[in-house]
Every structure is written in C-alpha cells, then in structure tokens.
Amino acid sequence: MKTLIAAYSGVLRGERRAEAARSENKNKGSALSREGSGRWGTGSSILSALQDIFSVTWLNRSKVEKHLQVISVLQWVLSFLVLGVACSVILMYTFCTDCWLIAALYFTWLAFDWNTPKKGGRRSQWVRNWAVWRYFRDYFPIQLVKTHNLLTTRNYIFGYHPHGIMGLGAFCNFSTEATEVSKKFPGIRPYLATLAGNFRMPVLREYLMSGGICPVNRDTIDYLLSKNGSGNAIVIVVGGAAESLSSMPGKNAVTLRNRKGFVKLALRHGADLVPTYSFGENEVYKQVIFEEGSWGRWVQKKFQKYIGFAPCIFHGRGLFSSDTWGLVPYSKPITTVVGEPITVPKLEHPTQKDIDLYHTMYMEALVKLFDNHKTKFGLPETEVLEVN
C-alpha cells in the first residue's frame, strides 16, 4: 500500500514539474513574442517614417518642378513682350555712363552683323537644348505629332495655324528641341519666321537667332529656299496678327482665304507645302474681343497696318495662383500635328491660276488634317474648322 501511495505521489510530483515547465516555457514564449513584436513594431514605424519622408520629398520635388515650369514660361513671355525694348533703353542709357564703350562696341558689331538674320541667322544647338525648354514644354504640356516622313532632298514651307496670342506651340516645337523635332524629322532644319522688326532690337535678335528664328520677309525666305541647300523647313504663321485678334478659348478659326503669298513663294522655289495645326493654341489665353467697327478694333487695325502687329488686351493666370489674372498662360495641352506634304512644282513665274490651285489644295488639306485629328484631342465630331 505504501508503495502504491509513494508511486502515485511521484506521478503527481512529475505532473506538477511538467506543468511548471510548460508554464515557464509559455511565459518565455510570451516574453519572446512581446520582444519580437516590439522589434517588428519598431521596424514598421521606421518603414512608415521613411515612406512619409519619401512622400514629402516627392511632393516637394513636384512643387519645385511646377514652379520651374511657371518660371520657364514666364521668362519667355517677358522676353517676347519687353526684352527688345528694355535692352534698347539700357544700351542707350549706357552711352551716358562710364560704360559707354560697351554700348559702342555692341552697336559697332550690330552694324557689321545687320544682315545675318536675312541669311538664316546663327542657330545654336546648345541654346535649343536648354533644360528650360523642357520645363516650358511640360508646363502645358506641348507635344509634336508627326504624320508623314519628310525628304531631306526637298525644301518645305510649313503653314502653322492658328496664331493664338503668342504662337507658343510654334516656338516650343520648332525653335527648341524640347519636343525632339530634329529626331522626328531627321535632316530637316526648321526656321520659325517672325516679324522682321524683332531683329532690329539689340540682344533680342541674338536670342531669337540662336533658336533658329528668322524674319518673315521675302529676302530671307528666298535665301533659305535657294541658297541654303535642301532640308530647310520655313515655318510661317500664316494668319499673323489678324488671326491673333480672334484668338479665344473654344474657337477654332484660321485666317487663310486671302493669304496666298506663302503659296507663291512655294511655287517659285518648288518647296512643298505642309499644313500644320496646333490643337489647344487658342486655349492658353483669354482676351477682350472688340467688335468690327468699334474704336478698339480700329486701333488694333491701325497698329497692324503701320507697325506689323496688333495689340491685344489679354490675360492668363497669376504667377503664384491660377485663381488670379496675370501674364502666365493657362496650363492647357497644346498638340501640334504636322500633316502630309503637298508636292509643289517649281515655277519661276507662277500665274494667278497656279497660285489659286495650290492654295485651294492647301486649304482642303488643312481642313482634312483638322477633321482627322480633332476627336483625339478633346473636340467633338461636330466641330468645324472656320476658314476666314
């Protein structure tokens, strides 16, 4: 009996020791679990903190990018509006200071270099590839769409439509490499033609020439199409100042019916005509439209007749806020579509019938280009290009 009791007691003691061991192991496991949980919790906190840092950094970088885009656009707008006049005033003032020699040397250089713009100017690939133009492009954004290849053995006249207020799409696509025009049209040298008066402005003329911009006059175009080899593409904003007066958001209209000079030049040199339309060019600024017969329109037409440009009362957004008015254009997409070239024969003395024929072909090609692409860029199928 004693033996049985002793054995039973031993079993009980063994069970108690086993239970105690299990309890101890459980407590250790709980401690390890809490310790591990703490370690993993700390890791999660660090990971979360890093994600927050990267998120803030990305947001800050995004804001910096946006500010750089606004500044890049504003510098071009101010250059377009006031750089020429400002530099002229500064140089004239410099003549009255101890630095008069600088102004004298520049004007001496200007006298020797006066005719350079008429021969295509001095384009600089370095200037055309400035990073500022990529920020300029991304602000809207602006893109260039190629529909057909261009032969390097031919010369071309691109008709650019519409003018808009400043022709921002024309500048970005053809006077910079931001949209890779040279890669899309290898072997083609684009020359954006603008008012000849801009090349009488000191410093501004150098800035324009560096981008491949030239005067829009007969002497310059004759030189580029006859004495500058092949592969030249003269980009002419056909509607000019008259077209800018009707520029407003939501309107697709071009001034073209009575603009035939560019067709005559194409025939005289056998340069192919290339219709080009920029969707969104009219969306980036709002302007006051004066009715025909009003005093405002009278003033605009007088400026256009005697000076070559028509002053517009327009506005975009403010520098620091899109909710205020200012000179910064609205951030709206601009897509420039380059159409199929129209083969033009070389006729030294084209008749009016020849000019009318190719002018009609050009108008039809432009309307077709517009109709084929309008729905791709947010316009309804019912939208019609107004040709004035």
Curated annotation (Swiss-Prot):
Pathway: Glycerolipid metabolism; triacylglycerol biosynthesis
Major localization class: endoplasmic reticulum
Endoplasmic reticulum is among the record's keywords: yes
EC numbers on record: 2.3.1.20, 2.3.1.76
Pfam families, sorted: DAGAT
Bilayer topology: Multi-pass membrane protein
Keywords annotated in UniProt: Acyltransferase, Cytoplasm, Endoplasmic reticulum, Glycerol metabolism, Lipid biosynthesis, Lipid droplet, Lipid metabolism, Membrane, Transferase, Transmembrane, Transmembrane helix
Cytoplasmic side: 1-69, 113-388
GO molecular function, one term: protein homodimerization activity
Subcellular location: Endoplasmic reticulum membrane; Lipid droplet; Cytoplasm, Perinuclear region
Subunit comment: Forms multimeric complexes consisting of several DGAT2 subunits. Interacts with SLC27A1 and this interaction is enhanced in the presence of ZFYVE1.
Name assigned to this protein: Diacylglycerol O-acyltransferase 2
Lineage summary: Eukaryota, Metazoa, Chordata, Craniata, Vertebrata
Gene that encodes the chain: Dgat2
